[in-house]
Amino acid sequence: MVQAVSTSGQKQAFAAAIAGRPYFQALLGRDLALWADNPGAPTRLFTVDRAALAVGGTTAQLCGDPGDWEELDSFLRFVGVQALTTSRVPPAGWLLRRNLFLYGLPAGRVLPTPPLPSGLTLDRAPSVSTIAQELFSDRPERWDHFYSETCTALAHGFARVVALRDPEGRMVSTVGAYAMANGEAYLAMGETMAPLRGRGIGGWLIPTLANELAGEGWNVTFLCEESRRHFYERLGFAPMGQYGQYEMKTTGI
């Protein structure tokens, strides 16, 4: 049964479902802390049998076994979800959109860091609006969700975002720990301006933030697609597992 998280018992059940589950314990742990008691939140939280479910816009995250996949399918379709990221393999009929590979850096470990590219400076408080514009200029609904979610997480200590700027002050690269909870910091949105890619900019910024977080006692994680695995392994991150993002099943007429 799908139940919205509102009571203390439901919050405990949600927390139990994500405990010890890399990626989910950070992302959904942040969401539980920020949104469980906020009816106007951009992310809605549910328990599904012994699983935890977070729905934000047209995407959802599922941690654990929902039991009745047909009920879950109907619910996700009703609330407008188009893509589901999960640690489980759904029944036949769900369409795999992409495999997502989990990588990490354990607390206390240190990655080798190349020299900072010449002329660039580190910005520890970049404009969230500027980052949203760079990442989602063609998706205004995603822009709004990202901006609201990130500003709230930063204000409450559940996120940390950094950027690099060129001598003219323009942001040329960014990455962030957008979910920090339960001892885990989840990295995402690592981007460098297209004309500057291949110059080692992201290869400096990402390990720098990861080392900082690991040095503070955080286990650092992130998800990436197949095409990016070599890059992150070259930086020294260790593979930890694999999840999947699935599309909603098509229905007949």
Predicted regions and their residues:
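Conserved active-site alpha-helix within GNAT-family acetyltransferase domains
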Residues: 88-97, 203, 226-243
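Short amphipathic alpha-helix that is part of the acyltransferase structural core
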Residues: 1-28, 99-102, 107-147, 165
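Conserved catalytic-core motifs of GNAT/GCN5-like acyltransferases
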Residues: 96-108, 238-253
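Conserved GNAT acetyl-CoA-binding A-motif
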Residues: 77-88, 213-225
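Conserved acetyl-CoA-binding loop-helix of GNAT-fold acetyltransferases
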Residues: 67-75, 188, 192, 198-215, ...
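A conserved beta-strand-loop-helix scaffold within acyl/acetyltransferase catalytic domains
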Residues: 40, 142-191
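A conserved beta-turn-beta hairpin within the catalytic core of GNAT-like acetyltransferases
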Residues: 56-61, 179-188, 197
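N-terminal charged segments
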Residues: 1-92, 141
